[in-house]
């Protein structure tokens, strides 16, 4: 049924996008500047600075960064492995910041420096179409500069830049092998389609029929990526890739709105609109994010969320982001100017923090989140996920979780590993099959995650772990995840229940029915805390002057364990100050085991979970 509904949704989205692409009224094409900006926006951004300390902070950050570019040499075509992406991203940041600085200050030094940057990029032999993200971002960079500086640029420079956008940007998408993003369901679709639409809208007058056809193709392709937000707004590639993919999706739709007065149906996709809430709940009390999959843990204001707040007329969507700016967490990312653009239309004095303490996402990467509050670094945060390892950018982490309490993240996720480092070492990184070398990377495989392992075996990469129940009462909050498909071949049933009591003590309960062979089961978490086994069933963690106890309960043979440091390969990032702690269970063939591990700052605390009808949990 779920597969049928997603297929039906895809048909609807494709039909909608196709209809919109055929009815775009190019007679309404706005004059330059037409990308993102409408009449009055520049004045509104200046007024935003006058009434908002946060806006003034962001504006000053952009201007000071642009000042630094004035004396810098233009970027060069320097590859990093198989990518030019770092150069494309730097170019986008420079041109966007310099163009913003010119429009808001009228200082021609910024426009002249942006012109110099663009002309240097036009001299590149190509923008590396074999890795099309590089082309997508570079095309957007020059499109913004061409459009925002249109009245400043000499005709000769416009011609050079417009020709480069057409030849090295738009026409690169004609190569079907290189432009596979048209068929992609992930961030590549969003980033590359956005870049192509920017290039086409900016230079529409130069090749109108070509540009219209390319925009139509992009709008027919983009709904494939829109499916990823179903059904609740979560992003299957994690926090970092939401910021990337959705940031460019916002850029795409906002450009259509400003240039043509339409959103092409994108802004009516409800799960897409809900996705800003997902990012809010990925923010933890420590000021970090829940960094599952290929994501870092760093956290700052997310500029693209301000488009959602504007679109939904709900400033509270960015309440957490406004708080982050006050904490000094202003992002240095290349899309920062859209904070000023979208934020200027909001009354940010009317924001309020979220009221709900829990949030759940079903779909490709199911997640349950609990947060005890929103105003203190000592608030409790817990998040647990399902999913499968064969998803894009996924790790082998079904059943894994993070846990913050007393201002400490006790159970951590190591997040992403540098791609270039692995690729240069010859690692087959993007192969997600069962026997892929990808799973041997410590940060990506199961050994580093806060989940189970049976007999040291890999998880079943195609086994989808679903959230099958959630509960949210003052005395009991949590979720139940069916991990049976994850451990197919080693167990006939694995159900993980995560529950927090009224004092935010966490219990992870695992119901295991062993397969037809004996199993050694490792229950493990990764932590930065000091660890000590203080009793046969108890491990004490200490960090930043705080203490947490892990206490095991169950009628099975088990021992507490602190694992030795991992033996990293030469090309892996070494995770210093990391410990893996937990319990090792010995199960007989076909044995049923119910075990609990309680994580509490009270040594004697132990929770017994209510009896659950586990037979109802199978999918």
Region locations from a protein language model:
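Bacterial Sec-dependent N-terminal signal peptides
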Residues: 1-23
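CBM-like, beta-strand-rich accessory domains located in the C-terminal region of large
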Residues: 21-22, 322-329, 422-619
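Aromatic-lined, polymer-binding surfaces characteristic
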Residues: 26, 33-50, 54-288, 295-296
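Terminal accessory carbohydrate-recognition/targeting modules of carbohydrate-active enzymes
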Residues: 27, 33, 372-435, 441-446
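Primarily extracytoplasmic ectodomains and periplasmic/lumenal surface modules that are beta-strand-rich
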Residues: 42-43, 53, 377, 408-410, ...
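Beta-sandwich/jelly-roll carbohydrate-recognition scaffolds of carbohydrate-active enzymes
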Residues: 54-57, 63-66, 71-77, 356-358, ...
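Histidine-centered active-site/metal-ligand motif
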Residues: 134, 188, 241, 392-398, ...
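Carbohydrate-active enzyme catalytic cores, enriched for enzymes
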Residues: 203, 244-410, 471-476, 480-482, ...
């Amino acid at each position: 049924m779920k597969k049928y509904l997603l297929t039906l949704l895809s048909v609807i989205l494709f039909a909608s996008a196709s209809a919109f692409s055929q009815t775009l009224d190019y007679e309404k094409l706005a004059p330059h500047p037409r990308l993102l900006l409408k009449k009055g926006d520049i004045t509104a951004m200046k007024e935003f600075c006058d009434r908002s300390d946060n806006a003034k902070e962001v504006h000053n950050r952009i201007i000071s960064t642009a000042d630094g570019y004035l004396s810098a040499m233009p970027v060069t075509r320097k590859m990093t492995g198989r990518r030019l992406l770092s150069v494309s991203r730097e170019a986008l940041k420079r041109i966007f910041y310099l163009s913003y600085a010119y429009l808001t200050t009228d200082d021609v030094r910024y426009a002249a420096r942006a012109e110099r940057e663009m002309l240097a990029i036009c001299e590149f032999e190509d923008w590396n179409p074999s890795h099309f993200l590089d082309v997508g971002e570079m095309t957007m960079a020059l499109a913004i500069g061409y459009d925002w500086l249109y009245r400043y640029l000499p005709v000769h420079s416009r011609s050079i830049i417009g020709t480069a956008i057409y030849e090295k940007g738009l026409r690169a998408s004609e190569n079907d092998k290189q432009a596979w993003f048209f068929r992609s369901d992930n961030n590549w679709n969003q980033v590359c389609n956005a870049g192509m639409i920017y290039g086409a809208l900016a230079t529409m007058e130069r090749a109108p029929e070509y540009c219209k056809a390319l925009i139509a193709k992009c709008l027919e392709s983009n709904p494939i990526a829109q499916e990823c937000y179903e059904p609740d707004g979560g992003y299957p590639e994690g926090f970092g890739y939401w910021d990337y993919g959705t940031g460019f999706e916002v850029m795409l739709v906002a450009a259509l709105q400003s240039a043509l007065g339409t959103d092409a149906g994108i802004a009516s996709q409800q799960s897409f609109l809900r996705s800003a809430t997902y990012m809010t709940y990925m923010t933890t009390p420590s000021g970090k994010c829940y960094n599952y999959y290929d994501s870092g843990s760093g956290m700052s204001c997310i500029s693209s969320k301000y488009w959602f707040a504007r679109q939904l007329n709900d400033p509270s969507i960015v309440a957490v982001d406004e708080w982050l700016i006050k904490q000094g967490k202003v992002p240095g990312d290349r899309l920062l100017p859209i904070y000023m653009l979208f934020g200027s239309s909001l009354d940010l004095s009317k924001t309020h923090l979220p009221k709900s303490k829990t949030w759940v996402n079903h779909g490709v990467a199911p997640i349950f989140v609990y947060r005890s509050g929103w105003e203190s670094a000592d608030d409790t945060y817990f998040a647990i996920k399902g999913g499968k390892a064969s998803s894009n950018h996924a790790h082998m982490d079904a059943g894994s979780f993070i846990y913050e309490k007393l201002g400490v993240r006790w159970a951590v996720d190591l997040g992403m590993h540098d791609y270039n480092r692995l690729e240069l070492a010859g690692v087959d990184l993007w192969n997600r099959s069962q026997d892929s070398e990808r799973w041997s990377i410590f940060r990506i495989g199961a050994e580093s995650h806060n989940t189970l392992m049976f007999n040291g075996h890999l998880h079943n990469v195609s086994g989808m772990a679903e959230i099958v129940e959630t509960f949210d009462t003052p005395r009991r909050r949590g979720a139940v995840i069916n991990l049976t498909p994850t451990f197919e071949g080693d167990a006939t049933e694995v159900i993980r229940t995560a529950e927090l009591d009224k004092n935010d003590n966490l219990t992870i309960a695992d119901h295991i029915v062993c397969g037809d062979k004996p199993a050694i089961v490792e229950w493990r978490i990764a932590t930065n805390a000091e660890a000590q086994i203080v009793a046969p069933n108890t491990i004490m963690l200490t960090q930043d002057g705080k203490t947490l106890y892990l206490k095991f309960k169950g009628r099975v043979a088990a021992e507490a364990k602190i694992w030795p440091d991992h033996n990293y390969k030469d090309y892996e990032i070494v995770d210093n100050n990391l410990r893996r702690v937990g319990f090792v269970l010995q199960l007989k063939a076909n044995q049923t085991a119910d075990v609990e591990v309680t994580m509490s700052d009270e040594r004697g605390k132990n929770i017994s979970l209510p009896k659950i009808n586990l037979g109802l949990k199978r999918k």
